[in-house]
Amino acid sequence: MPFDVTPRLFEIDESLNYGIRYEPSRLSGYKFGINTMTDKACSHVSNTFKCVDHPTYFYGCEEAIVSNREPHELEDVKVKWRICRDTAWAMLDITLPNVSYKITSDKHQTEVNERIILLHGIDGSCSNIALFGGIDFFCTNKQVRGKYAQLKKKNTSGFSMENFISDLTTARQDFDEHCRMLQVWAETPIKANVRLLLDKIVKSERLSKKMYSLAQQEISKRGKNMYALYSAFTNYSSYADERNGFSLRNTGNDTQAQSMWNREQQVAQWVDSKPFQDLLVA
């Protein structure tokens, strides 16, 4: 009888494929994390810090994702790794092309695919995080659904990878519900001065001015609605080059991936802000 072997959704990036062991630090209350492949220190953390290595985390999350989705939903999956802090911080961005929803305004139609984001840090730079979102197929803007569509567990002494996988298995968010919300946004006109609105939401004159220019571009394509404004936000968090004028400073540090992720969190805060939410119920 042949074995029932489920194909992998992804292979872990080669640079992350190592184990971790710990050695005492000369600083009381701390320990060194040692990369078992290179035998070099990769972290300096509190003795109460507890985490698994990257392969254990990401493949464990994969198991949970596969367990609550239909086989056809997992076909042609697209994955992208973002890695920084000398491989101590890693993010896996998964897009499911076969899970999609059309968003239509009076001027434009686009398709949104489901997105799953997994973050992991072995040096205390981030918690164990799984988030759910989407990706706008028209412009490939990445979406995070906000603070309620996530699973987050800190690397404290009580952290259990087994429990995290169990929670992730039952935490699948309703993608259709997310997209129905986006459709409402596409049907909701912006009943405010966009420039003044951005000043209230962004709270940075320089950033607000550049965001206004980006919002005008999105409005010209999608119409003057709340989804167009949201698309301007997600453009900012998806790109950092001449396409949108929001380039990152070249600091010479290994932090660009983390900086772009911080932008996504910033956008989630803007969407949850009172000025944005007030216009949705006006």
Predicted regions and their residues:
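Feature for intrinsically disordered/low-complexity regulatory segments and propeptides
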Residues: 1-62, 68
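A short acidic/basic microdomain associated with nuclease active sites
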Residues: 66-98
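Intrinsically disordered, low-complexity regions enriched in serine/threonine
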Residues: 1-21, 76-79, 93-282
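Functionally constrained cores in energy, signaling, and assembly domains
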Residues: 35, 39, 44, 85-86, ...
